[in-house]
Design a protein with these regions (language model features):
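Symmetry-related core transmembrane helices of the 12-TM Major Facilitator Superfamily/SLC fold
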Residues: 178-186
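Hydrophobic core of transmembrane alpha-helices in multi-pass small-molecule transporters
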Residues: 32, 101, 112-128, 153
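Glycine-rich segments within core transmembrane alpha-helices of 12-TM secondary carriers
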Residues: 143-164
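Cytosolic juxtamembrane N-terminal segment immediately preceding the first transmembrane helix
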Residues: 2-30
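Intracellular juxtamembrane helix-capping segments at the cytosolic ends
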Residues: 49, 125-141
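Extracytoplasmic
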Residues: 22-57, 74-78, 163-167
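Conserved MFS/SLC helix-loop-helix module at the cytosolic interface between two early adjacent transmembrane helices
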Residues: 73-112
Length: 186
């Protein structure tokens, strides 16, 4: 390719596209769905789960508490894994874990299984939520990591708003178990 052609293509944005907007938008959509389908799902589904299973709301939210504890317990390992292997693969694996966990959660019949699935979900959430996404942005645009992280958090702020509405609609139409299966397909 000749120098004038390269300069023309670069001016048109074909060769020298800034990766920041695409990375923020792609990870932003990923974070909206990740937070909405996992972290915020009980905001809508706790009541229907309690009504269907007869379990107390305390037990239902205790499951989420166990997820938070699991997230804390694997944080150091997660950080090391991201540093050693990059964020993309870790986030992808976390997304698979969360999807599997949501399907498992939709199938639980006992309190013990319910609580165990939340521990599993906690591990998956740690691998695919903000921590890994922030690291991914810094790996993509190291010199503008702070800016990218600020933009990404704006996307994440919409997760509860979007998924409480979506979750309520799906629960009314399909029930909580099928809603979780659809959330898993994210």
């Amino acid at each position: 390719m000749t120098a004038p052609m390269r300069q023309h293509l670069s001016q048109q944005g074909v060769l020298a596209r800034d990766p920041l907007p695409f990375a923020v938008c792609a990870l932003g959509i990923s974070q909206i769905t990740a937070w909405g389908t996992s972290y915020y799902c009980l905001g809508v589904l706790a009541g229907p789960i309690a009504a269907d299973t007869g379990w107390s709301r305390s037990l239902i939210f205790f499951g989420f508490t166990l997820a938070l504890l699991a997230m804390g317990l694997v944080s150091t390992w997660t950080g090391r894994a991201i540093d050693n292997h990059g964020a993309r693969g870790i986030m992808s694996f976390g997304t698979l874990l969360v999807s599997a966990g949501l399907v498992a959660l939709s199938r639980v019949q006992s309190e013990a299984a319910y609580l165990a699935v939340w521990v599993f979900l906690g591990v998956g959430m740690r691998l695919c939520l903000y921590d890994a996404a922030f690291a991914a942005l810094v790996q993509i645009v190291p010199s503008r990591g702070r800016t990218a992280i600020s933009y990404l958090t704006l996307f994440g702020a919409f997760a509860s708003t979007v998924f409480w509405i979506v979750g309520h609609f799906l629960n009314e139409a399909l029930g909580w178990r099928q809603t979780l299966v659809l959330f898993a397909a994210r």
